[in-house]
């Protein structure tokens, strides 16, 4: 197969591993800088150009699209889909999961367990919003944030009111979530490929911190997940329409709660912690399931 990897940086661990795994299995793998690919949209034959030449002959595309380039990255991926190239994750599914609010609404509609979450526009509604999520302590999240940036834990209702007001004053869209104390600053990252959880790790926040992101100094360890957690992760990825996803789950007193479904999960933490060849399993998934013109939405999304 000829596989394109959409990535801003060929030196990133995840990108390097996908190239290695693809080449080891006899495929040609080309890394394409997402922002340097440009499109001829209004032609009978949809084209993508890169450094002055059309990109042609690809069988599959692996999108590693950073949150900051979601809009442009999805447009490039859609163009590949219109050419009949098989995407590891579809543009529609990526856009869906990147909109945190929409993602939670879809998960909620399908009965997937979530922390109680509130969303409001007017400062007048702040007191009721806080009551809605069972009061303080509570977590405030900026909708555009990644890697734990723009996430605040408010210990008191007074602090919560001040922080929510400040964000609203800055015209920042935020959501307010109940704080799951019993999770103890830990979450579980389930790595879903197809309809299986192929690897899982526990991420523990460093002392004095509540965000367990590895980018924020959290530590990772092996964990055995329960059948219910496994089912929840697989369902969450399915609701989003993602073939490959990192599903972040909290252990609460009333079962597993999904915090986020990540469409471009990093491979470094999960491979180092579990010792599994996650990149190889992703390439195997493409070999089994890839093929021309198999995009469910046919790039119309």
From Swiss-Prot:
It comes from the Bacteria. GO terms for biological process: protein modification process; SOS response; translation. ATP binds at residues 141, 178-179, 187, 211-213. Belongs to the RimK family. Keywords: ATP-binding, Ligase, Magnesium, Manganese, Metal-binding, Nucleotide-binding, Protein biosynthesis. The lineage of its organism: Bacteria, Pseudomonadati, Pseudomonadota, Gammaproteobacteria, Pseudomonadales. Its EC number is 6.3.2.-. GO terms for molecular function: ATP binding; metal ion binding; ribosomal S6-glutamic acid ligase activity. Mn(2+) 2 binds at residues 260, 262. Its cofactor is Mg(2+); Mn(2+). This is Probable alpha-L-glutamate ligase. Mg(2+) 1 binds at residues 248, 260. Residues 104-287 form the ATP-grasp domain. NCBIfam families: PRK10446.1 (NF007764), rimK_fam (TIGR00768). Binds 2 magnesium or manganese ions per subunit. One of its GO terms (cellular component) is cytoplasm. It comes from Stutzerimonas stutzeri (strain A1501) (Pseudomonas stutzeri).
């Amino acid at each position: 197969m000829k596989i394109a990897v959409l990535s801003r940086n060929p030196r990133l661990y995840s990108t390097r591993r996908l190239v290695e795994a693809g080449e080891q299995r006899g495929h040609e793998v080309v890394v394409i800088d997402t922002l340097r690919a440009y499109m001829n949209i209004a032609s009978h034959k949809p084209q993508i150009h890169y450094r002055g030449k059309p990109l042609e002959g690809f069988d599959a595309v692996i999108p590693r699209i950073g949150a900051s380039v979601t809009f442009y990255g999805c447009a490039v991926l859609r163009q590949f889909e219109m050419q009949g190239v098989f995407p590891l994750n579809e543009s529609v599914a990526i856009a869906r999961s990147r909109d945190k609010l929409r993602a939670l609404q879809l998960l909620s509609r399908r009965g997937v367990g979530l922390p109680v979450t509130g969303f409001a526009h007017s400062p007048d509604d702040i007191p009721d919003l806080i009551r809605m999520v069972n009061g303080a302590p509570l977590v405030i999240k900026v909708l555009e944030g990644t890697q734990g940036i723009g996430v605040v834990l408010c210990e008191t209702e007074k602090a919560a009111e001040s922080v929510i007001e400040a964000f609203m004053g800055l015209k920042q869209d935020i959501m307010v979530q109940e704080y799951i104390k019993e999770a103890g600053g830990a979450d579980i990252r389930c790595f879903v490929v197809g309809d299986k959880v192929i690897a899982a790790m526990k991420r523990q926040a460093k002392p004095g911190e509540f965000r367990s992101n590895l980018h924020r100094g959290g530590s990772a360890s092996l964990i055995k997940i329960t059948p219910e957690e496994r089912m929840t992760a697989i369902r969450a990825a399915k609701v989003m329409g993602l073939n490959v996803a990192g599903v972040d789950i909290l252990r609460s007193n009333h079962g597993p709660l999904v915090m986020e479904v990540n469409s471009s999960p990093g491979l470094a933490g999960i491979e180092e912690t579990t010792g599994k060849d996650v990149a190889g399993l992703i390439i195997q998934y493409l070999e089994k399931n890839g093929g021309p013109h198999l995009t469910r939405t046919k790039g119309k999304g």
